[in-house]
């Protein structure tokens, strides 16, 4: 599997590079970084003390010409540029970027008519199994329980609520036959009045080096149920991304997510 990594100098990019180098079925053929990065020209394995022969570059076409797959955990504007290059070079994409607008998501959907794309806000096996647990719980706590989603991440995260929190909200709302867009409440401040029982609330915490904590609270009278997932390392995301690459190796064009990859549908 000839794999290139986007955002190669970042925390997630380095974790992905390490995962690819440690996988006997995978070959690192490219490492993209943003224009102006001080790491351009550096060997992709330097942070591991390894010489890979792959240099960090901002030349999209040079990287895509070598790759069969790109793994991208960057930012929406960067990912959209990578999608255009992937279409030019017929490269399949594994996308873990979050914070897309509706218009940008539509661009991913359109691109998937020509290339295979796995797009998931969270690629850990644990989170995706948790989504199934939430669907089950929501169906059984549909009356008399208020639903709140609380997430916490490191101080450097730029979007809120997290993509994973939104995935959880969509799983719960879908199980209840609702649209998350219509029932979500993002944060509360001041005199808000009594809680609307049809809503799903979101709260975001940012601080320190928290990798990612998510709790969905079903609060009833006399009891509450909490379903929580906590990430202690980004390695679970990297392993999930490689699993997604293997999934795409046997697929043609189409837009998939980790539920497809893990056979949870």
From Swiss-Prot:
BP terms from Gene Ontology: diaminopimelate biosynthetic process; lysine biosynthetic process via diaminopimelate
Pathway: Amino-acid biosynthesis; L-lysine biosynthesis via DAP pathway; (S)-tetrahydrodipicolinate from L-aspartate: step 4/4
Keywords (A to Z) from UniProt: Amino-acid biosynthesis, Cytoplasm, Diaminopimelate biosynthesis, Lysine biosynthesis, NAD, NADP, Oxidoreductase
Residues that bind NAD(+): 7-12, 33, 96-98, 120-123
KW Amino-acid biosynthesis (keyword) present: yes
Pfam family, one: DapB_N
UniProt keyword NADP, yes or no: yes
List of residues binding NADP(+): 34
GO molecular function terms listed in the Swiss-Prot or TrEMBL record: 4-hydroxy-tetrahydrodipicolinate reductase; NAD binding; NADP binding; oxidoreductase activity, acting on CH or CH2 groups, NAD or NADP as acceptor
Gene Ontology CC annotations of this record: cytosol
InterPro entries registered for this protein in UniProt: DapB_C (IPR022663), DapB_N (IPR000846), DapB_N_CS (IPR022664), DHDPR_bac (IPR023940), NAD(P)-bd_dom_sf (IPR036291)
EC number per UniProt: 1.17.1.8
Subcellular location: Cytoplasm
Binding-site positions, (S)-2,3,4,5-tetrahydrodipicolinate: 154, 163-164
Record's catalysed reaction(s): (S)-2,3,4,5-tetrahydrodipicolinate + NAD(+) + H2O = (2S,4S)-4-hydroxy-2,3,4,5-tetrahydrodipicolinate + NADH + H(+); (S)-2,3,4,5-tetrahydrodipicolinate + NADP(+) + H2O = (2S,4S)-4-hydroxy-2,3,4,5-tetrahydrodipicolinate + NADPH + H(+)
Active-site residues, Swiss-Prot/TrEMBL: 153, 157
Function: Catalyzes the conversion of 4-hydroxy-tetrahydrodipicolinate (HTPA) to tetrahydrodipicolinate.
Family: Belongs to the DapB family.
HAMAP family xref list: DapB
PANTHER family according to UniProt: 4-HYDROXY-TETRAHYDRODIPICOLINATE REDUCTASE 1, CHLOROPLASTIC-RELATED, DIHYDRODIPICOLINATE REDUCTASE
Matches recorded under NCBIfam families: dapB
Name of the protein in question: 4-hydroxy-tetrahydrodipicolinate reductase
Provenance organism: Burkholderia ambifaria (strain MC40-6)
Gene assigned in the entry: dapB
